[in-house]
């Protein structure tokens, strides 16, 4: 699963997801792409599940690019602990995705295969997405 090799700080604030994505909202590498329509945190597990599903469907043909990276640690407190005594420990990593952000890109396959593969990957995502073609 994806995670940063090292970070400056172990824990981060939760932050806010307002507005639309101003970066990573154009197709750069492939011909087809999956674009987010809603804001959300997408976990490293969800990214990996979508990537695997697309790879399996496309078989040998095609190349896949993952355009998001989980660089935000999410802390979780142990169950049945009292309030106070600091913040919980980092449990998993998420990528902050805003509307318009490209999640996956694909090329080297037909449009029908790419669309079907992207739909399978979209089912693994916690948000609504759309299939985009470059050009």
From Swiss-Prot:
Gene name linked to the record: rpl16
Family: Belongs to the universal ribosomal protein uL16 family.
GO CC, alphabetical: chloroplast; mitochondrial large ribosomal subunit
Pfam family, one: Ribosomal_L16
Entry protein name: Large ribosomal subunit protein uL16c
Chloroplast recorded as keyword: yes
Top-level taxonomic group: Eukaryota
Lineage: Eukaryota, Viridiplantae, Streptophyta, Embryophyta, Tracheophyta
Organism: Phalaenopsis aphrodite subsp. formosana
Keyword terms: Chloroplast, Plastid, Ribonucleoprotein, Ribosomal protein
């Amino acid at each position: 699963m994806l995670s940063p090799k090292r970070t400056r700080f172990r824990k981060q604030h939760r932050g806010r997801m307002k507005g639309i994505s101003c970066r990573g909202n154009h197709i750069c590498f492939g011909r087809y792409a999956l674009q987010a329509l809603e804001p959300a945190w997408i976990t490293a597990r969800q990214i990996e599940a979508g990537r695997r599903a697309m790879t399996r469907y496309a078989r040998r043909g095609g190349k896949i690019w993952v355009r998001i990276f989980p660089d935000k640690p999410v802390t979780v407190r142990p169950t049945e602990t009292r309030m106070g005594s600091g913040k919980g420990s980092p449990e998993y990593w998420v990528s902050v995705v805003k509307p318009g952000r490209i999640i996956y890109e694909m090329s080297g396959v037909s449009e029908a295969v790419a669309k079907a593969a992207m739909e399978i990957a979209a089912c693994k995502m916690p948000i609504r997405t759309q299939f985009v073609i470059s050009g």
